[in-house]
Amino acid sequence: MLDHTRAPELNIDLDLHASNSPKGSMKGNQFKEQDPCPPQPMQGLGKGDKREEQGLGPEPSAPRQPTEEEEALIEFHRSYRELFQFFCNNTTIHGAIRLVCSKHNRMKTAFWAVLWLCTFGMMYWQFALLFEEYLSYPVSLNINLNSDKLVFPAVTVCTLNPYRYTEIKEELEELDRITEQTLFDLYKYNSSYTRQAGARRRSSRDLLGAFPHPLQRLRTPPPPYSGRTARSGSSSVRDNNPQVDRKDWKIGFQLCNQNKSDCFYQTYSSGVDAVREWYRFHYINILSRLSDTSPALEEEALGNFIFTCRFNQAPCNQANYSKFHHPMYGNCYTFNDKNNSNLWMSSMPGVNNGLSLTLRTEQNDFIPLLSTVTGARVMVHGQDEPAFMDDGGFNLRPGVETSISMRKEALDSLGGNYGDCTENGSDVPVKNLYPSKYTQQVCIHSCFQENMIKKCGCAYIFYPKPKGVEFCDYRKQSSWGYCYYKLQGAFSLDSLGCFSKCRKPCSVINYKLSAGYSRWPSVKSQDWIFEMLSLQNNYTINNKRNGVAKLNIFFKELNYKTNSESPSVTMVSLLSNLGSQWSLWFGSSVLSVVEMAELIFDLLVITLLMLLRRFRSRYWSPGRGARGAREVASTPASSFPSRFCPHPTSPPPSLPQQGMTPPLALTAPPPAYATLGPSAPPLDSAAPDCSACALAAL
């Protein structure tokens, strides 16, 4: 019913429109006849028009704006708002579209904006934690249990009996006499009943002149609270002083540098330690005078020290061992070392499937002031590793059977960023002086010897020396003792940097040892055992129980453990964790990350273009505008392009009336301010200004 009432009204409007249309058409025709250029709203220059801007010279025309039908190769958004709206409408990131779809509800927009930003922050906080964990380079320890035939390790056994070489036997006897005199003067100890005290003192005056650095008695400084003036008292042992039995006295010997400008006392609170160290210091000097520190040993055969040797129930031979001499531990024998052509293999565990030795522990040519223990010293190590008897060995007790069971363990560590280890020592700044592979102990001892040669001018006899370097002897290097003890103190404090330079190897094989002891031989069996050993080795055992010791070394089991390190967080796991966090917080994929990168790139480009436009507008020369105005003023109106005024210009129908001010001619087109913005003018604003056309025609 409402439709019927509205239909006539619509027809009436159409009729009125029809009746008015001729009139409007007529007015339009009259307007065209009076004005050669119809009025158009001024929106800036049209497409293709040249713009005049301030500058140093004429500027090329602006590129023509693309129409709806054509598209440029590279396009950027005109504003941040347009870029943001395009991103939110087209991205695959969840929640971004909620920032623009609810723009008419500011509360929802604010809620989603805060939620989106919080989610974004939480995700990147998790990213930071993941990267922090990855850059800490954590490792995982993998433990594997393997079972196979095992290579038997090298075993080194020493006699604990420093040998008296024939070449230096007289000097050692002289040192013994000086030491006896020192013990008598300090402790009234009379070791030779055939000598009287007076004769002993007279001989000591002659003997002490042959050896420098005599032992002295030193008074310790008083406590600081006693109020007494501290003084470093010292007296020679040649003085008739009471026996050293007071706690405020120490025993030591003086060491000085080359020009005697600096001296110190190497002191000990125990007289036993002081005498042993003093004797050891002189023994090293005497031993360094040998032309060869490893001469042919006077123990003619292996049987003089080792009565029996069996491995896997088979007897040993000379091809299974090598020998060397240690300054403190005497003659040493290494079984199954790298020089052995056929390394021993263990295919069964147990005491009967290992190495069994019966050792002689008598000390017929013993140096009592140098070694105070009896028995033997043993060490288990790898085939290509030197035997550091001071660091890893232990003593065997005479009259006891020592059974040592072994378990092999291998450790493979990661180097580089994951750990401070070296593969073969080639990247360690210390030269290896040992004819063996790199180990941390080899590096540390080589480092000390290197510093000893550099600072003291000679080599320490306990470590290998390079070619062309002599061992230290105070007859040639009078101050080497001063230098050595100073260097030893710096070495203990790691002032030399040896412990920091020498890194552990990445691959290490260790042998875990556990020892068991039992009395051997028993009371019932000792008679026939000692008799058989004497007949077999053509040697009479004087002190039966204290003259022999037995050693058994075997694998407890053939299962060995391998501890290997692996990266806990790899690049693959890092990317997986990052993707999991991205999917958790935004439910997106890798392409969404590319969209984010594209957004950041567009933001940077828009910012750069805006800064460049502002820079040009601020620092462009203002003199160009006046010159441009004069150039346009001198240009005839007929020379304007047709697109600037599309209708042909003609003189006005009548001159202006008298008394009226004639219109001024337009000397320059108006500045195109609309072109300074980031957005292009609309398409319908390309029509020229009618008034401008008319004035230009004048």
UniProtKB/Swiss-Prot annotation:
Protein's membrane topology: Multi-pass membrane protein
Record-level GO cellular component terms: acrosomal vesicle; apical plasma membrane; ciliary membrane; cortical actin cytoskeleton; cytoplasm; cytosol; external side of plasma membrane; extracellular exosome
Cytoplasmic side: 1-110, 611-698
Cysteine disulfide partners in this protein: 158-332, 256-263, 309-316, 421-506, 443-483, 443-502, 447-498, 456-483, 456-506, 458-472
Protein's UniProt keywords contain Glycoprotein: yes
Reaction(s) catalysed (UniProt annotation): Na(+)(in) = Na(+)(out)
PROSITE patterns linked: ASC (PS01206)
Transmembrane region(s): 111-131, 590-610
Glycosites: 190, 259, 320, 339, 424, 538
Matches recorded under InterPro entries: ENaC, ENaC_chordates, ENaC_CS
Region of interest (Disordered), ranges: 1-70, 213-243, 637-663
Reported impact of residue 588 to I: Changes function of the channel including conductance, gating, selectivity and voltage dependence
Annotated site location: Cleavage by Furin: 205-206, 231-232
Assembly and interaction partners: Heterotrimer; containing an alpha/SCNN1A, a beta/SCNN1B and a gamma/SCNN1G subunit. Interacts with WWP1 (via WW domains). Interacts with WWP2 (via WW domains); inhibits the channel. Interacts with BPIFA1; the interaction is indirect via SCNN1B and inhibits the proteolytic processing of SCNN1A and SCNN1G and the activation of ENaC. Interacts with the full-length immature form of PCSK9 (pro-PCSK9).
Record-given protein name: Epithelial sodium channel subunit alpha
Native organism: Rattus norvegicus (Rat)
Lineage of the species this protein comes from: Eukaryota, Metazoa, Chordata, Craniata, Vertebrata
